[in-house]
């Protein structure tokens, strides 16, 4: 091995390197994308990106969230609906929504029943933990009360997005995640499922939801 490395180094006109010298980058463009943008400006970026990723974009506020949610559910054909066991439903005044007969709340103690409920569901709904404006991506920090199947087995995916969760791009999301206890599963969801062949023929809904709606709560 030493002779092999020596031969390569001699061809390159230098000594064999035995350690790594990390480069000192002069530029870090990933840090400056949308730098200085306000939350309203990032919201506009997200809204525009949704037009490119086949995702319906809806704005509302806390007071009107319940009615908006009912309208979105009706537009997608109603239940069954599967949701995470998430305290934010109560925080946003949606506790009564969870009592609907067509709503199944994920229960970590019920094992396979959760997956079967997600398979039957027309709508899967989660809250976004971090939202990337640049790509229109919802970031889910999954846990025992929020299984992965909620967001990919139902026909339609609905994300509830407090405006405060919107950041410019993946760079900021990575910083936020590093400061947390990193979960075993982090999902990045960018609209409905997409697949394309070598000729770039795009097909929506092959490996997951056929439709997606983002509901942004603008005052939270």
Swiss-Prot record:
SUPFAM superfamilies, per database record: NagB/RpiA/CoA transferase-like (SSF100950)
GO biological process: lactate metabolic process
Signal peptide: none
Gene3D superfamilies named among the record's database cross-references: NagB/RpiA/CoA transferase-like (3.40.50.10420)
Disulfide bonds: none
Family matches, as InterPro entries: FTHF_cligase-like_sf, LUD_dom, LutC, NagB/RpiA_transferase-like
Functional summary from the UniProt entry: Is involved in L-lactate degradation and allows cells to grow with lactate as the sole carbon source.
Protein family: Belongs to the LutC/YkgG family.
Annotated HAMAP family: LutC (MF_02104)
PANTHER family linked to this entry: LACTATE UTILIZATION PROTEIN C
Protein name: Lactate utilization protein C
Organism: Anoxybacillus flavithermus (strain DSM 21510 / WK1)
Name of the gene this protein is made from: lutC
